[in-house]
C-alpha cells in the first residue's frame, strides 16, 4: 500500500535478460500498475503479457468484491498495454481512459480502439473518483507521442508513466540513481526538451509521491529526483570528473589511457572513469558520458574507419543529443591514423562541445612524443577542472544578499542559522542582489 487508498498491483520479471531487446537487466524489471480505491475505482496501466494471470489476480485481491470502473492508460508500449483487452474482457462495465494517440495505437495493437468504452482525454481534463480528483497531463515524446501523466490532488501523487523509472525488479534493493540514470539516458535521454516541458508543467503541483511504470514509488525527498531529471534533461553536468572511453586491439591504446588516468589522478581530478567499450555495458558507458563533464575518446584506425565498438558508442551519444561537454581525443594507427578526425566528425552535430587543444597521436605504440601529449592532455583537462573550482569559489565570494526588512547587505553564502545583525530576521527574509 502506497497511501490509504492507493495500492500497488504490479509484477516483477526475473526472466528477462534484455529490456527492449538491448539493455542488460541483471536484476530484472518491474512492470508497475496501481489502483485507487474510492467511490469509483481506477486501475493505472496493465503489465507485460507474460504476467496476465498474476496481474488480474492482484487486481482481485486488491478490490475484494468490488470491480474497477476505469483503466487509465498512460503509455502504450506493450510492457504496459499488453493486457488492456484482457482487462476489458474480465470487466465489461469498465471504461478505458487514454489520449487520442493511445487509442490510435490500440487499433494497431488490438484491431480495435474500444470506441464503445473509451474516454479520450486532453491536457488538463479531470476525473472525479469521489474524494480523489485526477488531473490528466499530456507528456508527448516522454518518450512516445501518446504519453500522459496523472496527478491525484488528494494524495498529491504524480503517476509519471516511464519518467522517473529505473531498471531492476522491486524485490532487489539497490541505489536508485545509478539504474535510473542508465534507464533515463538509454531510453528517454534523446527527448530532453520534451522532459523539460513536462517539468515546467508539473512545477506548480504539490507532489509528495511519484509512481512510475518501472522501479519504486518515490515517496521521500521528491524534489531531489525532480532536480536530477532537470539536470539530465537540460544536459547539465551532474558530477565533475573525466570519463575515458576506449577500445584497444593489442594493448597499446590501453596503455595510453591507463597513463592518462594515472596522470589525471596525480593532478587531483575528482573522478576518473576508465571504460573498455569492448567489454563494458554500452548503456552504462553512455550514462557516465552524460553524468560527468569531460569525455576522452581513444581508439584505433580500423578498416579505414574507427573500431566498431567506438563507432557504436559515439552513435549512441549523438542519437541522445550529447552536448555541453569537453571532449579529448586519442588516436592510434600504424601507417595512416585517422581516428581522431572521424570521431570529431561524428560529433559535429552535437551542440556546445569543446574539444581540447591537445590530441594524442600514437603511431603503433607510445613514445616520448605521444607520452608528452598524454601529459599535456591531462594538464589541459585538470586545468579546466581547477578553473571551474576557482570560478565557483569566486562566485560564492561575490554573492550578495539584502535583508528585505532593514536593507542590510551580506556578502557570501547565507548559513542556514544566519540572523541579520541589524534586525535579527533569518535567511528566508534575504534576497539575492542582482
What is each of the regions a protein language model found here?
Residues 2-60, 149-152, 156-160, 253:
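Conserved beta-strand hairpin/beta-sheet module of binuclear metal-dependent hydrolase folds
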Residues 50-97:
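Active-site metal-binding motif and surrounding structural segment of the metallo-beta-lactamase
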Residues 1-4, 98-147, 191-199:
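Metallo-beta-lactamase
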Residues 403-406, 420-423:
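Short cysteine-rich clusters marking metal-coordination/redox-active sites
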Residues 44-46, 68-76, 96-99, 158-162, ...:
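Active-site neighborhood of phospho(di)ester-bond hydrolases with catalytic His/Asp-centered motifs
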Residues 409-413, 428-432:
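Short, non-ligating residues that shape and space the ligands of small metal-coordination modules
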Residues 170-210, 214-217, 259-275, 285-398, ...:
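FMN-binding flavodoxin-like domain, especially the glycine-rich phosphate-binding loop
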Residues 400, 417:
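Residues immediately within or flanking Cys/His clusters that coordinate Zn2+
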Amino acid at each position: 500500500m502506497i497511501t490509504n487508498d492507493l495500492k500497488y498491483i504490479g509484477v516483477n520479471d526475473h526472466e528477462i535478460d534484455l529490456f527492449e531487446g538491448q539493455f542488460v537487466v541483471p536484476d530484472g524489471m518491474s512492470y508497475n500498475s496501481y489502483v485507487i480505491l474510492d467511490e469509483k475505482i481506477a486501475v493505472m496501466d496493465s503489465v507485460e503479457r507474460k504476467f496476465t494471470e498474476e496481474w488480474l489476480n492482484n487486481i482481485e485481491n486488491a478490490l475484494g468484491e468490488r470491480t474497477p470502473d476505469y483503466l487509465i492508460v498512460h503509455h502504450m508500449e506493450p510492457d504496459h498495454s499488453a493486457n488492456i483487452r484482457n482487462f476489458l474482457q474480465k470487466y465489461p462495465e469498465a471504461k478505458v481512459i487514454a489520449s487520442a494517440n493511445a487509442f490510435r495505437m490500440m487499433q494497431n495493437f488490438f484491431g480495435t480502439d474500444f470506441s464503445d468504452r473509451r474516454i479520450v482525454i486532453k491536457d488538463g481534463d479531470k476525473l472525479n473518483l469521489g474524494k480523489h480528483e485526477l488531473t490528466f497531463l499530456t507528456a508527448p515524446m516522454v518518450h512516445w507521442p501518446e504519453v500522459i501523466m496523472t496527478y491525484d490532488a488528494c494524495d498529491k501523487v504524480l503517476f509519471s508513466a516511464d519518467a522517473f523509472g529505473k531498471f531492476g525488479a522491486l524485490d532487489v534493493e539497490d541505489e536508485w540513481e545509478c539504474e535510473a540514470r542508465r534507464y533515463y539516458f538509454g531510453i528517454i535521454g534523446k527527448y530532453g526538451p520534451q522532459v523539460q516541458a513536462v517539468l515546467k508543467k508539473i512545477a506548480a503541483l504539490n507532489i509528495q509521491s511519484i509512481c512510475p511504470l518501472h522501479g519504486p514509488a518515490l515517496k521521500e525527498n521528491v524534489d531531489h529526483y525532480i532536480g536530477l531529471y532537470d539536470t539530465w534533461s537540460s544536459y547539465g553536468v551532474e558530477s565533475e570528473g573525466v570519463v575515458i572511453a576506449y577500445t584497444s586491439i593489442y594493448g597499446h591504446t590501453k596503455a595510453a589511457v591507463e597513463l592518462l588516468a594515472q596522470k589525471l589522478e596525480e593532478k587531483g581530478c575528482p573522478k576518473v572513469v576508465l571504460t573498455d567499450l569492448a567489454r563494458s555495458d554500452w548503456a552504462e558507458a553512455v550514462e557516465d558520458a552524460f553524468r560527468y563533464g569531460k569525455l576522452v575518446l581513444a581508439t584505433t584506425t580500423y578498416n579505414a574507419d574507427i573500431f566498431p565498438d567506438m563507432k557504436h558508442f559515439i552513435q549512441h551519444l549523438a542519437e541522445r543529443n550529447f552536448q555541453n561537454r569537453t571532449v579529448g581525443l586519442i588516436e592510434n594507427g600504424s601507417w595512416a591514423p585517422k581516428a581522431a578526425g572521424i570521431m570529431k566528425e561524428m560529433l559535429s552535430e552535437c551542440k556546445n562541445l569543446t574539444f581540447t587543444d591537445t590530441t594524442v597521436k600514437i603511431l603503433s605504440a607510445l613514445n616520448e612524443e605521444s607520452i608528452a601529449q598524454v601529459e599535456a592532455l591531462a594538464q589541459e583537462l585538470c586545468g579546466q577542472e581547477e578553473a571551474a573550482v576557482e570560478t565557483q569559489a569566486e562566485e560564492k565570494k561575490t554573492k550578495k544578499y539584502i535583508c528585505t526588512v532593514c536593507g542590510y547587505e551580506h556578502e557570501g553564502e547565507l548559513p542556514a542559522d544566519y540572523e541579520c545583525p541589524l534586525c535579527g530576521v533569518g535567511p528566508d527574509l534575504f534576497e539575492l542582489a542582482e
